[in-house]
Curated annotation (Swiss-Prot):
It is found in: Cytoplasm, Cytoskeleton; Cytoplasm, Cytoskeleton, Spindle; Cytoplasm, Cytoskeleton, Spindle pole. Belongs to the CKAP2 family. Residues 336-345, 362-376 have a biased composition (Basic and acidic residues). Residues 1-28, 153-175, 214-236, 336-403 are annotated as: Disordered. The modification Phosphotyrosine is found at residue 599. The keyword Nucleotide-binding does not apply. This is Cytoskeleton-associated protein 2. GO terms for biological process: apoptotic process; mitotic cytokinesis; negative regulation of microtubule depolymerization; positive regulation of transcription by RNA polymerase II. Residues 219-236 have a biased composition (Polar residues). InterPro entries: CKAP2_C, CKAP2_fam. The keyword Protein transport does not apply. Possesses microtubule stabilizing properties. Involved in regulating aneuploidy, cell cycling, and cell death in a p53/TP53-dependent manner.
Length: 683
């Protein structure tokens, strides 16, 4: 049956498949495929031999890997180049490649193209992983990158085998507390605290359970189907086999839980030493890196979790197959469980201790500072300050040096006592000088020197008592009250003593003023009586002009004396302490009030009725008074209706401005200012 003819428009260009070079290429690919099939068959046979013997290992050499890569390069050289034109010598190259690649034995081919995972060859739970299979499509085409990875993997495997050999040659770390293959309690006590019986039994059972599965190996057939993480059922079958092989040892070597010195415990130690002597336990390189990277706490946790997993698988396998021996195996299970529990308690206790030690301990000063800040935020302030200066220095010293010897504290107390006695003696001397009448300046110098040397002496109430007693009796009460306020602000203690002293000073001042007022009233009354008697004795025959001139002369003398006394007071600063009005002189004024009374009107009528006295027409009193500057300034701005009806003059020259020249004035002393006139009379 012939195919229909294709039109020329739809015909494709002639293909290059008919050329000899591409035919040779297809023939080469077929030959490589057959060679790969032979290689896989040889690898399966070798794998069976390795699983049966378990002592042969595949060693890859660098030369063999290079030969394998050369073969792969020749195989992939003409791939995907069907439609490209090649030079004429390509056929010769392929022929040379064909004749240069002889068939190699199956062992060499497997070494060059097959990678076998030799990590942990003694571990029964890990099997070699096949990279190439018959049904895998990737195994039929090997690229350059795959060849490169193959070479690197072979180098890595070679390095791991060398490391394992070095680890095997290294000396084994001795067991702590062991002597001639047995653990001695006295040696353990020499480097750690003695553990409880439960801890000892759990440690012994842990060591026994750790050495038994590594010492006894399962059948080589099962190793190809057993893995550590993924295949759980095969792991359980493997564990049941080695537990069944070592069940006699576990029955013979059953350790007691509560007895310290029993024969069975010695047999446990002997069994442990015997198994550990026969078997060398090594860890793979990956496990080493993990153990080095982890901390001590994480290693304890991982070991405890691994112990728990091992206990679970062991208990399940025993329950499934070895049912006739429940007592011995349950004891082993209990003792193995006790070990991770104790480890967890130890790690938890350690973590708690570390967390407590990591937290900084708060000092008493910090607590006081936080308390004061909280009180300030709430608006609470201490009403009563601390007791004294002396007692405040002691807690600060105690906080800085909490641990001091007995003799140093005694010496500090003696020094503090002497210091307090010295300050108290100084204040008592000042009080004695005040009572004796010593000048104020000397006492102030002594007190100021004491305050310069000891600034905290202001917190003692005796200092403020001395200042209050220095003030003269004639000083105003405001000065005493100001001293009392300063003492309260400084925190003087005890403040009750200061209160009693202030009360005594005020009572003395009030009594002195009362006595002075009585004396001045008596003197004023006597002067008025003398004047009346002199007027009555002279009678109406007295010349009014002479009387007026005498009164004016007397008044001028009095006012001149008063002015001189005021000038002397302003010039003499020491006299300010003795007079009560000097401090308030700037705020007050002394003026003369011009007023009249019915008594004066009657006297005036008598004089006018007599007819002989026609020189003066008005008779008025002239009284010295004290007026406030502040009030005078305010009243001067008021209208005339609200001003005082009795005018006040500041000098005698202003009397002519008030009235006529015929007015007569009688000087009348003021009881409140009678001391001024009393002093003028005495001078």
């Amino acid at each position: 049956m012939s195919t229909p003819a294709v039109p020329q428009d739809l015909q494709l260009p002639p293909s290059q498949r008919a050329q000899s070079a591409f035919k040779e290429q297809r023939r080469q690919k077929l030959k490589e495929h057959l060679l790969r099939r032979k290689t896989l068959f040889a690898y399966k046979q070798e794998n069976e031999m390795l699983s049966s013997s378990r002592d042969q290992r595949v060693v890859t050499s660098e030369d063999q890997v290079q030969e394998g890569t050369k073969v792969l390069k020749l195989k992939t050289k003409m791939a995907d180049k069907e439609n490209m034109k090649r030079p004429a010598e390509s056929k010769n190259n392929t022929v040379v490649g064909k004749h240069c690649i002889p068939l190699k034995p199956s062992n060499e081919l497997t070494n060059s193209t097959v990678v076998i995972d030799t990590h942990k060859p003694k571990d029964s739970n890990q099997t070699p992983h096949l990279l190439l299979t018959e049904d895998d499509p990737q195994s039929q085409h090997m690229t350059l990158s795959q060849a490169f990875h193959l070479k690197n993997n072979s180098k890595k495997k070679q390095m791991t085998t060398e490391k394992q050999k070095q680890d095997a040659n290294m000396p084994k770390k001795p067991v702590l507390g062991s002597y001639r293959g047995q653990i001695v309690q006295s040696k353990i006590n020499s480097f750690r605290k003695p553990l409880q019986v439960k801890d000892e039994s759990s440690a012994a059972t842990k060591k026994l359970s750790a050495t038994i599965p590594k010492a006894t190996k399962p059948q080589p057939v099962n190793t190809s189907s057993v893995t550590v993480k993924s295949n759980r059922s095969s792991n359980m079958t493997a564990t049941t086999k080695f537990v069944s092989t070592t069940s006699q040892n576990t029955q013979l070597v059953r350790p007691p839980i509560r007895s310290h010195h029993s024969n069975t415990r010695d047999t446990v130690k002997q069994g442990i030493s015997r198994t550990s002597a026969n078997v060398t336990i090594r860890k793979g390189p990956h496990e080493k890196e993990l153990l080095q990277s982890k901390t001590a706490l994480s290693s304890v946790k991982t070991s405890s979790s691994q112990g728990i997993i091992r206990n679970k698988t062991l208990s399940r396998s025993i329950a499934s197959e070895v049912i006739a021996r429940p007592a011995s195996l349950s004891n082993d299970k209990l003792m193995e469980k006790s070990e991770p529990v104790d480890q967890r308690r130890h790690t938890a206790g350690k973590a708690i201790v570390d967390s407590r030690s990591a937290q900084p301990k708060e000092t008493s000063e910090e607590r006081k500072a936080r308390l004061s800040e909280w009180k300030a935020g709430k608006g609470r302030v201490l009403k009563r300050p601390p007791n004294s200066v002396v007692t405040q220095h002691e807690p600060a010293g105690q906080n800085e040096k909490p641990v001091g010897s007995f003799w140093t504290t005694m010496a500090e107390e003696d020094e503090q006592r002497l210091f307090t006695e010295k300050v108290n003696n100084t204040f008592s001397e000042c009080l004695n000088l005040i009572n004796e009448g010593c000048p104020k300046e000397d006492i102030l110098v002594t007190l100021n020197d004491l305050i310069k040397n000891i600034p905290d002496a202001k917190k003692l109430v005796k200092y403020w008592i001395c200042l209050a007693l220095i003030e003269p009796i004639t000083s105003p009460i405001e000065n005493i009250i100001a001293i009392y306020e300063k003492a309260i602000l400084a925190g003087a203690q005890p403040i009750e003593e200061m209160r009693h002293t202030i009360v005594d000073i005020l009572t003395m001042k009030s009594q002195e003023k009362a006595n002075l007022g009585e004396n001045m009233e008596k003197s004023c009354a006597s002067k008025e009586e003398v004047k009346e008697v002199s007027i009555e004795d002279t009678g109406v025959d007295v010349d009014p002009e002479k009387l007026e001139m005498e009164s004016k002369l007397h008044r001028n003398l009095l006012f001149q004396d008063c002015e001189k006394e005021q000038d002397n007071k302003t010039k003499d600063p020491t006299h300010d302490v003795k007079t009560p009005n000097t401090e308030t002189r700037t705020s007050c004024l002394i003026k003369y009030n011009v007023s009249t009374t019915p008594y004066l009107q009657s006297v005036k009528k008598k004089v006018q009725f007599d007819g002989t006295n026609s020189a003066f027409k008005e008779l008025k009193f002239l009284t010295p008074v004290r007026r406030s500057r502040r009030l005078q300034e305010k009243t001067s701005k008021l209208p005339d209706m609200l001003k005082d009806h009795y005018p006040c003059v500041s000098s005698l020259e202003q009397l002519t401005e008030l009235g006529r020249e015929t007015d007569a004035f009688v000087c009348r002393p003021n009881a409140a200012l009678c001391r001024v006139y009393y002093e003028a009379d005495t001078t």
